[in-house]
């Protein structure tokens, strides 16, 4: 039975295919026979997709609008010409005295048409037709039909007493006789609105059949009215014959127009399809160009996806599919031989003009070249850089390496978060702070993205404590019955830990924390975190740069700093910030988590460490690649990968000075470039070759570097975050980045502006920016 069913099914399918082939061979329409492939609904004639039908009408209207003056002039000339012909014919045959009502209607009809034409043109009729085209079309047809029938009955009523007794077929068509002198063409005047209707309103829409029906009714009305008037002297069969002839003629015209219109629509569909493909291709190319870099792991992911797509592609032949899959698998095997799966290909980087950007974010060490020996070997450092990059990429992809601070050596019953100091020390320490419990918090809104931290009379140094208090009190302190004094004590101690360096200071930390709060509430992550996890995340943001002394990881590696020895070249600064933060939290007078149990404290500590370590720019590409591969969109995926989402959020907030208004953005850039150049001056004194980012002498290229940074790092990061966005925050960020990028581009093209802005970046520098700070090693005292 089963086999019989299959045979019947395949037999029917074969028969269907055969019929389809015949239809395709003899079809006038040249459309697919498969119902799923058809793009046109044949009755009423329209595209199946509403968007395509709308676009078709818009294109028709736009085409008419571009020729509106030609249409206006041609219709006015045609109307006035027919009007003049009717007047001349009437005067020649002395018809004014006989056909008074007819000529009254002639003048009225002409005036109405002229007013209608001018009104439509004056009111931009094309734009109205785009939205209410169907209603206008039907209304206009009904109006014409009423006017035409009125014309017809008045005409025949005027001349019925003048009609000949014997009527032959040759004189039948309009039968507008006057004293048997001449056939007049007054009847043709009624067809003029139809001519106007075809050209001024797009009849090639789903209402076009109404025109053909009207045309047929007009012809039938002519013959029927004449028959009723001349019933005594005219044969009924002749009238029926003329009506049938009119019907056949109308159907023939309709079918021809119908076929032509289908072909036009198919041509439009092909054009529209190709246009969409070109736009999609351009968009894809643009997105690919804007990508930071395709890492090897992303390449593997894309190749596997491509292979799966080829396997399910029914249009491809089996051999082509097999070859494509095998080719992709060979590429994957070759990529897997590389060590740097989460890093961009170094060969690709070197081909680009912005390899110094990647050199910075990947901590690629530049040549250590002593001034006295400038012509030394230059190949060994390159090898060292490459090996260092490979070594960096060997880190596990699941969880970042967690380096315990030295304060963990002596562990008590609770972790360092719950470490208790003596009561006397606690009392003495608290007395050191002058708590302002009534601090003004109204002038900072935690919900507004564009807060002016720098673009004001003086920088907002109070923002750190104000923002920290508002957010931590909102999400945690108010629910845990913890003393506000402990919160203030923590915030004051953290603020005291920030040095007054140009960029990585407490104001930067306040901005990052505020933007983290906005992002986490605007993205689809806010309801996943518990109160204590939210507090830990905010503490991470507040302390992500604590103790920063205005130098980068690259500097610490080059100079063999003490911190490099402690943290083995792995995220040196970020581990230092973690240690500094936990050193503060280990004291009970600062510990807002002291009511949490040991297991919770361990989890919160791990969250803080992973979030702060994510701000290391050498991990930028890796984190972005992991996020892209996971394609986090569904809430269940977000819950499983919440740490990865938090890493992306703090990274976006850490670079958010690029996502604000130009005036604020420019001031942050000024601080950052001066901090970098200060490091470059220090490196130069020590005899190291400089990356262009830190070279004061390469300042003329700074704008190009800044544009590259925005395009290659910031834009891809924010664009990837859009998958989590449940509001419009990422769109706002992208618009600011693009505006700032455009502003830098315009400045670079104008030499006068370029020189002005470059000079402004390095002038009016406060003396406090020139102070050299050192890491606080007291946090490591046991």
Curated annotation (Swiss-Prot):
Region (Disordered): 376-396
Residues on Cytoplasmic side: 1-69, 119-135, 203-208, 261-782
Cofactor note: Binds 2 divalent metal cations per subunit. Site 1 may preferentially bind zinc ions, while site 2 has a preference for magnesium and/or manganese ions.
Assigned GO CC terms: endoplasmic reticulum membrane
EC category: hydrolase
UniProt cross-references to SMART domains, sorted A to Z: HDc
Keyword Transmembrane: yes
Top-rank taxon: Eukaryota
Designated gene of the protein: PDEgamma
Phenotype upon loss of function: During infection of Swiss Webster mice, lack of PDEgamma reduces peak blood stage parasitemia. In the mosquito, development of oocyst sporozoites is not affected. However, sporozoites released from the oocyst have higher cGMP levels, are immotile and fail to invade the salivary glands and, thus, parasite transmission to the mammalian host is impaired.
Pfam families according to UniProt: PDEase_I (PF00233)
Domain PDEase: 423-751
Protein name: cGMP-specific 3',5'-cyclic phosphodiesterase gamma
Ligand binding (a divalent metal cation 2): 545
CDD domains cross-referenced by the UniProt entry: HDc
An example molecular function term from Gene Ontology annotations: metal ion binding
Transmembrane segments: 70-90, 98-118, 136-156, 182-202, 209-229, 240-260
GO biological process: cGMP catabolic process; signal transduction
E.C. number(s) listed in UniProt: 3.1.4.35
Positions of the catalytic residues: 504
Biological role: Specifically hydrolyzes the second messenger cGMP, which is a key regulator of many important physiological processes. Probably by regulating cGMP levels, required for sporozoite motility and invasion of the mosquito salivary glands.
């Amino acid at each position: 039975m089963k086999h019989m069913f299959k045979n019947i099914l395949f037999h029917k399918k074969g028969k269907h295919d055969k019929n389809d082939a015949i239809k395709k061979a003899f079809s006038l329409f040249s459309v697919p026979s498969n119902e799923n492939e058809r793009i046109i609904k044949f009755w009423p004639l329209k595209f199946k997709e509403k968007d395509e039908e709308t676009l078709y009408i818009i294109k028709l209207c736009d085409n008419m609008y571009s020729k509106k003056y030609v249409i206006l002039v041609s219709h006015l000339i045609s109307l006035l010409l027919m009007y003049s012909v009717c007047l001349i014919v009437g005067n020649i045959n002395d018809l004014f005295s006989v056909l008074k009502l007819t000529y009254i209607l002639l003048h009225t009809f002409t005036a109405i048409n002229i007013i209608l034409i001018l009104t439509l043109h004056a009111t931009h009729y094309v734009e109205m037709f785009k939205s209410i085209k169907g209603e206008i079309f039907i209304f206009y047809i009904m109006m014409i039909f009423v006017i035409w029938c009125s014309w017809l009955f008045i005409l025949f009523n005027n001349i019925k007493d003048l009609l000949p007794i014997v009527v032959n077929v040759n004189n039948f068509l309009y039968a507008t006789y006057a004293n048997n002198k001449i056939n007049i063409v007054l009847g043709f005047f009624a067809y003029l609105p139809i001519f106007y209707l075809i050209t001024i309103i797009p009849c090639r829409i789903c209402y076009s059949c109404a025109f053909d029906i009207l045309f047929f009714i007009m012809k039938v009305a002519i013959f029927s009215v004449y028959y009723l008037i001349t019933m005594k002297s005219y044969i009924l069969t002749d009238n029926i014959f003329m009506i049938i002839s009119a019907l056949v003629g109308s159907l023939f015209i309709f079918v021809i127009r119908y076929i032509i219109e289908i072909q036009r629509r198919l041509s439009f569909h092909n054009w529209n399809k190709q246009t969409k493909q070109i736009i999609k291709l351009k968009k894809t190319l643009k997105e690919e160009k804007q990508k930071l870099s395709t890492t090897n792991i992303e390449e593997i992911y894309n190749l596997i996806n491509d292979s799966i797509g080829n396997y399910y592609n029914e249009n491809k032949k089996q051999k082509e599919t097999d070859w494509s899959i095998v080719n992709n698998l060979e590429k994957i095997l070759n990529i897997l031989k590389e060590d740097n799966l989460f890093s961009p290909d170094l060969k690709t980087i070197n081909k680009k003009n912005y390899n110094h950007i990647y050199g910075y974010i990947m901590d690629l060490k530049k040549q250590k070249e002593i001034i006295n020996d400038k012509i030394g070997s230059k190949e060994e450092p390159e090898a060292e850089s490459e090996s260092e990059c490979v070594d960096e990429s060997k880190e596990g992809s699941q969880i970042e390496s967690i380096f315990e601070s030295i304060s963990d050596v002596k562990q008590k019953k609770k972790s360092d978060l719950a470490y208790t100091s003596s009561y006397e020390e606690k009392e003495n320490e608290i007395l050191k702070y002058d708590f302002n419990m009534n601090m003004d918090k109204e002038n900072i809104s935690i919900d507004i993205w564009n807060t002016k931290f720098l673009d004001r009379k003086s920088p907002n140094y109070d923002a750190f404590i104000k923002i920290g208090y508002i957010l931590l009190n909102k999400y945690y302190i108010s629910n845990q019955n913890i003393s506000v004094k402990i919160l203030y004590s923590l915030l004051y101690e953290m603020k005291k830990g920030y040095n007054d360096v140009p960029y990585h200071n407490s104001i930067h930390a306040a901005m990052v924390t505020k933007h983290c709060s906005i992002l986490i509430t605007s993205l689809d992550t806010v309801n996943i975190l518990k109160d204590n996890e939210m507090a830990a995340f905010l503490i991470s943001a507040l302390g992500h740069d604590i103790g920063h002394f205005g130098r980068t990881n690259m500097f610490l590696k080059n100079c063999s700093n003490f911190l490099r020895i402690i943290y083995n070249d792995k995220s040196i600064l970020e581990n230092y910030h973690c240690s500094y933060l936990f050193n503060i939290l280990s004291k009970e007078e600062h510990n807002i988590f002291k009511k949490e149990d040991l297991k919770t404290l361990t989890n919160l500590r791990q969250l803080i460490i992973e979030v702060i370590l994510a701000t290391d720019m050498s991990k930028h590409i890796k984190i972005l690649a992991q996020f892209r591969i996971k394609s986090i969109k569904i809430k269940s995926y977000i819950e499983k990968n919440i740490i990865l989402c938090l890493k992306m959020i703090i990274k976006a907030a850490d670079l958010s000075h690029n996502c604000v208004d130009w005036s604020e953005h420019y001031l942050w850039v000024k601080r950052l470039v001066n901090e970098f150049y200060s490091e470059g001056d220090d490196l130069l004194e020590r005899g190291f070759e400089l990356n262009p980012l830190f070279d004061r002498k390469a300042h003329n290229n700074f704008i190009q570097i800044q544009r590259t940074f925005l395009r290659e790092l910031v834009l891809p990061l924010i664009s990837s975050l859009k998958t989590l966005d449940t509001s419009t925050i990422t769109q706002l960020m992208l618009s600011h980045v693009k505006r700032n990028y455009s502003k830098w581009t315009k400045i670079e093209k104008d030499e006068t502006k370029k020189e002005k802005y470059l000079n402004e970046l390095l002038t009016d520098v406060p003396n406090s920016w020139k102070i050299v700070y050192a890491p606080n090693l007291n946090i490591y005292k046991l």
